Amino acid sequence: MAEEIDTKEFAWISEVFKKKKVFTGLSYTEREALIEDMYKISYKPEDIIFKEGDDPTACFLIYKGKVKGTKNKMLVLKKEVSTLGPGSFFGEMAFLTFAPRVATVVAEENMVCFVLLKSTFQKLLSKNPAFKSWLKSLSAKRLIKLNSL
């Protein structure tokens, strides 16, 4: 169930945004507006956050806990592509490529994430072409790396 973000969490997200390369092209006001549109959600171990092939609707910032990303190889094999913990973003690549999810992401332990909806992210990209261009470049590099696994 979705919950509102409290003051302490807002400050934590703001600090993460300041340190993440992906948000350096945004003004303070743009970063704060993004945070105001986010919400908090909790997951239990083995909860599937999204599956490879799903349409993207949100990206996630891990506050507590860990996730594991896997990619299908052939029909029955799965390859672990990443394990992410607090302060990590995931799911944003699909916003830029307009393609389905490229991996399945599952909670490895009890976790809390902050969620940013695709509609909010797209609104920001339309207002900031330089940021959009930079993110597309970053996304292309990540996609090449992922497809080589």
Spans of features found by a protein language model:
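Cytosolic regulatory regions built on CNB/CRP/Popeye-like sensor folds
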Residues: M1-L149
